[in-house]
Amino acid sequence: MEFSPPLQRATLIQRYKRFLADVITPDGRELTLHCPNTGAMTGCATPGDTVWYSTSDNTKRKYPHTWELTQSQSGAFICVNTLWANRLTKEAILNESISELSGYSSLKSEVKYGSERSRIDFMLQADSRPDCYIEVKSVTLAENEQGYFPDAVTERGQKHLRELMSVAAEGQRAVIFFAVLHSAITRFSPARHIDEKYAQLLSEAQQRGVEILAYKAEISAEGMALKKSLPVTL
């Protein structure tokens, strides 16, 4: 997936009110960007980091610029726009870049399922195969090359795991897919130190037949693509 038009570069001054960030451009202009990430963004929003942003041609938008990537002062690229996790996963599935999810003839998005009436990110279908339900999570929290999810307690994420367990119990295929959008991450684990309940449910889900996949994106200011399977430790 290439960024078109190309992203523009700035330096982060501060992120505030969760959805806003002030930056300064190379020519000295100060801009306020929309921040499309409700999470803690730990390690992704340090003042002085390089920010790569897009600009909308929608004249009705109050904040036409959107923060897409962080390039940390250590050189790591991080995708902070959480919408990209699903876009990249869909692209990788359709391109059959994810071997575990290849061989299906149909992909549907946002399908209602489960007793708690969630919407699954993707459902794959093929003749003579069980339906495959896929829930996608974006991973940007990193410490010493270790990637973690979540970066804050997530009751919604816990609900999704319960729903996936019910899908697996019905004989369908259930997958939790961690899209790793941080170039410095080399392995993945649930963030037990942040949300112990989520970590416990993830282990239970695996025992009950839910598959756990983690794939890392190659990220640059020019584009991104999910490429590499990472080891998962529960």
From Swiss-Prot:
Signal peptide: none annotated. GO terms for molecular function: DNA binding. Gene3D superfamilies: 2.40.50.580, 3.40.1350.60. The keyword Cytoplasm does not apply. The keyword Protein transport does not apply. Keywords: DNA-binding. Binds to DNA non-specifically. Could be a regulatory factor involved in maltose metabolism. This is Sugar fermentation stimulation protein A. It comes from Shigella flexneri. The gene is sfsA.
